């Protein structure tokens, strides 16, 4: 928390020294736990944290009876010195003087930090990233039980993003959200040696959905390995199931859209 406040305070100090009176700071802190697998063995694990902020500088000015509020945005890192920040903000303030947006009021806040909003319904923000990544790793390999078809490799990325928004009119709010992404390669060595690539992304702890995806991918990969040459062209009875039904009907839905006429 101290580091977070320090970064914001450094930006605020540089804004004041640069003569900027109107501003909005959107600081983002992204933490991640990453797992890399070869077959079922954990090959590498990594944790990282990226902290940066988007700073919008506003400049109020008039020409005749017309009143404007120009703006310019810059992206800053916590590694920047205060001197670097001051120069960037002075340049942004100068650039904002050429942007003739009709004047409008910035959103007003209370001047007090609002309680952080956690997306608790997802159950991702209130667990450690290592725990989240571990749960999805368990789900990923739960269906990998056969010898002829298996997961060749996999990657899992559990991320948590904290966003902190501060402006010159007293707004001070923050929120936190979690997300899990990754990819895996299924391989079947019975018959033809084939591989199937899949990726995934979840905003909640739906590990069962990942299990189903792995199970379906393994089954499809085995079917591909056992595939034979297509029969001659003609009329055949074909049964579609699962996601393939949705996929074929999406063609007709798209073609019936008014924009396609």
Residue spans for each PLM region:
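Active-site bordering "gate/hinge" segments
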Residues: 1-261
């Amino acid at each position: 928390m101290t580091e977070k406040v320090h970064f914001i305070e450094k930006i605020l100090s540089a804004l004041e020294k640069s003569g900027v009176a109107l501003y909005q700071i959107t600081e983002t802190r992204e933490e991640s736990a990453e797992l890399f697998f070869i077959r079922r063995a954990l090959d590498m694990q990594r944790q990282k944290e990226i902290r940066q902020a988007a700073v919008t500088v506003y400049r109020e000015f008039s020409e005749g009876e017309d009143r404007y509020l120009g703006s310019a945005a810059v992206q800053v890192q916590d590694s920047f010195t205060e001197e670097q920040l001051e120069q960037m903000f002075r340049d942004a303030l100068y650039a904002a003087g050429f942007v003739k947006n009709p004047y409008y009021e910035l959103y007003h806040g209370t001047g007090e930090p609002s309680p952080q909003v956690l997306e608790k319904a997802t159950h991702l923000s209130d667990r450690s990233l290592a725990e989240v990544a571990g749960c999805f790793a368990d789900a990923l390999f739960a269906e990998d039980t056969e010898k002829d078809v298996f997961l060749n490799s996999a990657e899992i990325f559990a991320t948590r993003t904290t966003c902190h928004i501060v402006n010159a009119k007293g707004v001070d709010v923050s929120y936190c959200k979690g997300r899990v992404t990754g990819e895996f390669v299924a391989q079947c060595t019975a018959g033809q040696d084939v591989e199937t690539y899949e990726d995934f992304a979840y905003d909640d702890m739906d590990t069962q959905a990942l299990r189903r995806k792995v199970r379906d991918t393994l089954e499809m990969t085995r079917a591909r390995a056992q595939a034979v040459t297509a029969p001659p062209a003609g009329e055949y009875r074909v049964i579609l199931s699962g996601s393939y039904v949705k996929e074929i009907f999406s063609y007709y839905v798209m073609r019936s859209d008014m924009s396609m006429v």
